Amino acid sequence: MKSKFIVIEGLEGAGKTSVIQQIITILHSNGIHNIISTRDPGGTPLAETIRDIIKKGMNGEYITDYTELLLLYAARTQLVAQVIKPALMSGTWVISDRYDLSSQAYQGGGRGIDIRLLQNLRDAALGKFYPDLTIYLDLPPSKCRARIRARGIPLDRIEMESLSFFQRTSIRYRELVANDSRIITIDAQQSIAELNATIRNNIERWLKSQQK
């Protein structure tokens, strides 16, 4: 089977990291071992530096919404060019913690940036390069915030946003995933056992569909 690009999406605290590890295990059990995982923003030295600015700020300087948006796309285009596309061309599967859907939801919903502008920027920066599969972990913003705060570590610049910010982001996520057949929505409120079973069933069903 040709190498694939899989993305895990969701709000902070939705459980993306655990699901990525589970998907890697599922792929291994299906004979797929040549896999790398990455994150967006991040994944290259330059993109990781940009990630730090987005997450931590820059010596207290105010970061405008459009500056944040352009930083995200700078990091993303670097990740695609330096990591994702070369890996896929070499036969390696790629699993990413976030990709472009995050900007469409966070910047379009949370920040309120014009949706058409975001779509045009996406097309200009990434062309027609889309994930083969996106898993969206749907969890209410209030529960995501509770999980984040339960970690007991300082919140980053994004995690400190208001509940209404994450509610707007969640609404936009749901609008986006409802119109794309390449995205599978998973109810992340399930128990760990139920969530694991749902992930496995969906991934294995998708793998079978790719073999046709």
UniProtKB/Swiss-Prot annotation:
Top EC class of this enzyme: transferase
Domain of life per record: Bacteria
Record key words, sorted: ATP-binding, Kinase, Nucleotide biosynthesis, Nucleotide-binding, Transferase
E.C. number: 2.7.4.9
GO molecular function terms noted in the UniProt entry: ATP binding; dTMP kinase activity
UniProt-annotated binding residues for ATP: G10, L11, E12, G13, A14, G15, K16, T17
UniProt-recorded name of the protein: Thymidylate kinase
Organism field: Baumannia cicadellinicola subsp. Homalodisca coagulata
